[in-house]
Amino acid sequence: MYELSTLYAAFEQYFGHPPTRIARAPGRVNLIGEHTDYNDGFVFPMALDRATYVAARPRNDQIVRVFSIKFRDEDQFDLQQIVRDERRQWVNYIRGVAKGLLARDLPLRGADLMIDSDVPAGSGLSSSAALEVAVGYTFQLLNNINLLGEELALVAQGAEHTFVGVKCGIMDQLIAALGEAGHALLIDCRDLSYRPVPIPAEARVVVCDSGVRHRLAGSEYNQRRAGCEEAVRLLKPALGKIQALRDVRSSDLAMYGHLLPPDLLPLARHVVSENERTLAAAEALAAGDLVKMGQLMVASHVSLRDDYRVSVRELDTLVDLALAAPGCFGSRMTGGGFGGSTVSLVAADHVDAFVAAMVDGYAIRTGRKLQPLVCTAGAGVSCVYASEEE
């Protein structure tokens, strides 16, 4: 469990005075619904009990000073002149959020910020969105700003679009802002409506980090998003008023798929079928049908591997090992892909045997050390420390 006292002491030592607020925003694991969010589709994530923490104290000027414990690096910028840092990507998440809040005509004053996290970076658990939402919420606390969770998520997403250069969907930021303990959230990424679904007590969610790291910015992620948008353009003459692949059904693709070139048809097929799987998965989990939920997770992985082509050998190995391990209902890659993690749904009374089988199997197959995370569905962003001093 993360020790707030360690962050408090580090802040006081570095800045010379104690923090007045500490905020946390969780990482997330997506149970199913991958690469659907930027297609106006459905996703089914849960917030984790792993989080990014921001200790903060307001200043009397317009300067923001930041120190990242994880990167052992510092940044300083002026709220009146926020520009991208071309060398260091991590600082752009923070600068972008500040810029986004100011763009909404929200008054900000300078601040000292110290950031730490126990969300593994690059593992597909959305450490970046946790950072954005935690920083945005911290600025809210320091400046007496009241944004709805959905609004905070949109500010955070905008930071990633404009300052980081990744055209991400809204899922990661939304679950970081709105997560509910003990539940996954079925989110409609078109209108941002959501429905909490309880995770049955007899099930556990286990995340396995492949150890393979991805770089999303400027990579194949943006190419796939562009491909999906092109598929919509090509299908519009036949299907009429479609705005995104969310509006296309499998039966539509069966009839009009010939309108798409060979490189785009598999992309569209994945997104369309994944939306259908995600809605079915929420119903299955709500009914406590873990077998059905697991089957849908496996079908999702096959689609991500074969049609969307975002899996890698290590992720496929983890899924194969999981499906052969004791008590596993289903397993799939989770996150953007090209590395990162898998998520498995496991019977609670088989978790220890499952974890042992995964560790041994992955070491034999790849020579890599695996540290599976048995995850609890956590709450969304919150203030975890507030002093009486302002």
UniProtKB/Swiss-Prot annotation:
Does the UniProt entry include the keyword Cell division? Answer: no
Could you say which protein family the record assigns here?
Belongs to the GHMP kinase family. GalK subfamily.
Q: What does this protein do?
A: Catalyzes the transfer of the gamma-phosphate of ATP to D-galactose to form alpha-D-galactose-1-phosphate (Gal-1-P).
Instruction: Report the GO terms under cellular component.
Output: cytosol
Coiled-coil residues are none
GO function terms (MF aspect): ATP binding; galactokinase activity; magnesium ion binding
How would you classify this enzyme at the top EC level?
transferase
Q: What does the entry give for GO biological process?
A: galactose metabolic process
Q: Which reaction does it catalyse?
A: alpha-D-galactose + ATP = alpha-D-galactose 1-phosphate + ADP + H(+)
Name-wise, this protein is: Galactokinase
Metabolic or biological pathway, per its Swiss-Prot or TrEMBL entry: Carbohydrate metabolism; galactose metabolism
Query: Residues in the active site?
Result: D172 (proton acceptor)
Q: Which residues bind Mg(2+)?
A: S128, E160
Fetch the Gene3D superfamilies from UniProt: 3.30.230.10, GHMP kinase, C-terminal domain
Q: Which residues bind ATP?
A: S68, G122, S123, G124, L125, S126, S127, S128
List, alphabetically, the InterPro entries matched. Galactokinase, Galactokinase_bac, Galactokinase_CS, GalKase_N, GHMP_kinase_C_dom, GHMP_kinase_C_sf, GHMP_kinase_N_dom, GHMP_knse_ATP-bd_CS
Gene from which this protein is expressed: galK
Q: Where is this site: Transition state stabilizer?
A: R28
Which species is this UniProt entry from? Chloroflexus aurantiacus (strain ATCC 29366 / DSM 635 / J-10-fl)
Task: Name the NCBIfam families for this protein.
Answer: gal_kin (TIGR00131)
Q: Does the keyword Nucleotide-binding apply?
A: yes
Cellular compartments annotated: Cytoplasm
Q: What is its EC number?
A: 2.7.1.6
Binding-site residues for substrate, renumbered to this chain: E34, H35, T36, D37, Y221
* Annotated keywords: ATP-binding, Carbohydrate metabolism, Cytoplasm, Galactose metabolism, Kinase, Magnesium, Metal-binding, Nucleotide-binding, Transferase
